UniProtKB/Swiss-Prot annotation:
Residues 77-120, 193-418 are annotated as: Disordered. Transmembrane segments: none annotated. The modification N-acetylserine is found at S2. This is Protein SSXT. GO terms for biological process: cell morphogenesis; chromatin remodeling; cytoskeleton organization; ephrin receptor signaling pathway; intracellular signal transduction; microtubule cytoskeleton organization; negative regulation of cell differentiation; neuronal stem cell population maintenance. The lineage of its organism: Eukaryota, Metazoa, Chordata, Craniata, Vertebrata. Belongs to the SS18 family. GO terms for molecular function: transcription coactivator activity.
């Protein structure tokens, strides 16, 4: 019991010195040993008492660590050894012995429950895993980090979704772009798109991002695009992020889009790569955004796009995209989109607002790239929503034209990518 009380006394002293901390750690070791002994003896009550004491010590240490980060320097060496035990023992009545060996981890995880984590924080280095994790954030922290950046992309996607965000996303975008890729996937996936998002939007995009991964390049591109996009930023980023991811994301993003997204996924994957280089053609506008040309068009469009609503601007943009940045694209798009789709497009665009105009486009060419026939069909579907009326409008036509564009898309995209 003396040991048991020693810790409390130590706490009472409130001495925050390496010696005091070491003493407490030693006490924790003794407590752990006692707990182990009692466990072996089957004395649960004593074990629980010591565990409580150990827990309090750990909490105390954690508090000290929080208040005095210098503790980290103090704790690391000795504490690592003892601490681990302490937390371990504390955290686990049964496993103390093993915990002792792994205790730190166990602490982090189990034991010390709060204290352990804190301690870990203190120890930080010692409990790297937990510490960082905790520090960073939950498991996701990694993701989070990426996510954050990634998220941004999402957000951009999200933005895409709502150009609104896109603006912010544009800001975040940069980061996002970078991360986007990497994290995008995880985040994206999980991210409930909206929320994964560390930035909400991004989340969704995120998961589109995963697709993005392919886009990773684009993200890179996007990033550089970002610069460009910054202005268009809204769109641009969005586009990049979204589009880049966009297509993919959009698809997911588009989830509404229904099938296409998935198909898109494939397409996106598939042309995502193309795009990815291209900056992801997907967004035609994006391409433009990405691509300086389109970029310019897009730029206007984006603004207009966002401003006007995805509808007309979109249409315009789409045309712009196609016409401008994506002249080639434009052609194809025009070809496939232009004639029938564009007509449909306006409506579609209107839908775009919801859909994110370019999503449609992305999809549009996404599909074009994605899978000429089937995907296009899907594409219409995906766009269908975007195309919404559009698809309905020209279920057949879009596809055929799309397919033509499809060739364009890819070829052009390839160029763009290049």
């Amino acid at each position: 019991m003396s040991v048991a009380f020693a810790a409390p006394r130590q706490r009472g002293k409130g001495e925050i010195t390496p010696a005091a901390i070491q003493k407490m750690l030693d006490e924790n070791n003794h407590l752990i040993q006692c707990i182990m002994d009692y466990q072996n003896k089957g004395k649960a009550s004593e074990c629980s008492q010591y565990q409580q004491i150990l827990h309090t010590n750990l909490v105390y240490l954690a508090t000290i660590a929080d208040s005095n980060q210098n503790m980290q320097s103090l704790l690391p060496a000795p504490p690592t050894q003892t601490m681990p035990m302490g937390p371990g023992g504390m955290s686990q009545s049964g496993p103390p012995p093993p915990p002792r060996s792994h205790n730190m981890p166990s602490d982090g995880m189990v034991g010390g429950g709060p204290p352990a984590p804190h301690m870990q924080n203190q120890m930080n280095g010692q409990m790297p895993g937990p510490n960082h994790m905790p520090m960073q954030g939950p498991g996701p922290s990694q993701l989070s980090m990426t996510n954050s950046s990634m998220n941004m992309p999402s957000s951009s996607h999200g933005s895409m979704g709502g150009y609104n965000h896109s603006v912010p996303s544009s800001q975040s975008m940069p980061v996002q772009n970078q991360m986007t890729m990497s994290q995008g996937q995880p985040m994206g996936n999980y991210g409930p798109r909206p929320n994964m998002n560390m930035q909400p939007n991004q989340g969704p995009m995120m998961h589109q991002q995963p697709p993005s991964q392919q886009y990773n390049m684009p993200p890179g591109g996007a990033q550089h695009y970002q610069g460009q996009q910054a202005p268009m930023g809204l769109m641009g980023q969005v586009n990049q992020g979204s589009h880049m991811m966009g297509q993919r994301q959009m698809p997911p993003y588009r989830p509404p889009q229904q099938g296409p997204p998935q198909q898109y996924s494939g397409q996106e994957d598939y042309y995502g790569d193309q795009y990815s280089h291209g900056g992801q053609g997907p967004p035609e506008g994006m391409n433009q955004q990405y691509y300086p040309d389109g970029h310019n068009d897009y730029g206007y469009q984006q603004p207009s796009y966002p401003e006007q609503g995805y509808d007309r601007p979109y249409e315009d943009s789409s045309q712009h995209y196609y016409e401008g940045g994506n002249s080639q694209y434009g052609q194809q798009q025009d070809a496939y989109q232009g004639p029938p789709p564009q007509q449909g497009y306006p409506p579609q665009q209107q839908q775009y607002p919801g859909q994110q105009g370019y999503p449609g486009q992305q999809q549009s060419y996404g599909p074009s790239q994605g899978g000429p026939g089937p995907q296009y069909p899907n594409y219409p579907q995906g766009q269908g929503q975007q195309y919404g009326g559009y698809r309905p409008t020209q279920p057949g036509p879009p596809q055929p034209p799309q397919q033509r564009p499809y060739g364009y898309d890819q070829g052009q995209y390839g160029n763009y990518q290049q």
